[in-house]
């Protein structure tokens, strides 16, 4: 059993992009930024507990951080893990919806 404290730390927030919006509209998929060491089971449990929806499947990917420089200084951006969470039919998750 995964602890409740761990479930609250797994999701960092929704990933908002043009591709994420298109998949949300067409495929009933939500994209989240998650901690780099999160597993698919933890992500599924966290989404089901926090948003009270049923998850069909979870796909993950890690985007490597880019090397950037500013003048003579050179640095590297952090790696980011994204989770594509596919919801079951009839399930809906709306981040923008307000009071009606």
UniProtKB/Swiss-Prot annotation:
GO cellular component term, pick one: ribosome
Species whose genome carries this gene: Aliivibrio salmonicida (strain LFI1238)
Family, as annotated: Belongs to the universal ribosomal protein uL23 family.
Alphabetical GO biological process terms: translation
SUPFAM superfamilies in the cross-refs: Ribosomal proteins S24e, L23 and L15e (SSF54189)
Superkingdom of origin: Bacteria
UniProt keyword annotations, A-Z: Ribonucleoprotein, Ribosomal protein, RNA-binding, rRNA-binding
Name of the protein in question: Large ribosomal subunit protein uL23
């Amino acid at each position: 059993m995964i602890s409740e404290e761990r479930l609250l730390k797994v999701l960092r927030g929704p990933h908002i992009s043009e591709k994420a919006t298109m998949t949300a509209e067409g495929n009933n998929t939500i994209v989240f930024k998650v901690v780099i060491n999160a597993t698919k089971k933890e992500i599924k449990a966290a989404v089901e507990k926090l948003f009270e929806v049923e998850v069909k499947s979870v796909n993950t990917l890690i985007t490597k951080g880019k090397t950037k420089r500013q003048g003579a200084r050179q640095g590297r951006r952090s790696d980011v893990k994204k989770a594509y969470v596919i919801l079951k039919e009839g399930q809906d998750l709306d981040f923008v919806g307000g009071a009606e």
